[in-house]
Amino acid sequence: MGKHLDSGSKLLDLGTENPFTPQLKAAGYSVSNTQGENLDDDFKKIAQTTCDCVTAFEIFEHLLAPYNILKELKSDKLIASIPLKLWFAEAYWNENDDWDKHYHEFEPKQFQFLLEKTGWKIKDSEFWTSPDQNKIGIRPLLRYFYPRYYIVYCERMQ
């Protein structure tokens, strides 16, 4: 974050307070989280919020239509991370909780296209793995080598 945002920047973090919130505040950022609104239905109200940067850590895969909020955001900067689609694992789906389902697990090119179509230009990005050290098997082994998460820093195209 410090690579792209000054300490003291005002952030709108899409999603309820999470483990990153206190870390961001400790680093000097002013953080406001959404309060559990349905971001598919209430995106216009949220998108009007004034801030230096919108952050979205593993949020867009939970939306039926992430295009809408991405298109409407008034911020000029966006930092977003997503879980990537893995060829050896099914998408996450909690049968008991409609808020805890992945409607999308993107390939990098799909997320990049979504961002481009909603007016964002990726300026920086990183991939990282998510090894599960407590399990034995082919899939846990593959998680050491295949990126599981993708994070981007974007700026609004003029």
Task: Describe the residue ranges of each PLM region.
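A short His-aromatic
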Residues: 58-62
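Conserved alpha-helix/loop element of class I SAM-dependent methyltransferases that forms part
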Residues: 1-9
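A conserved beta-strand element that flanks and buttresses the S-adenosyl-L-methionine
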Residues: 55
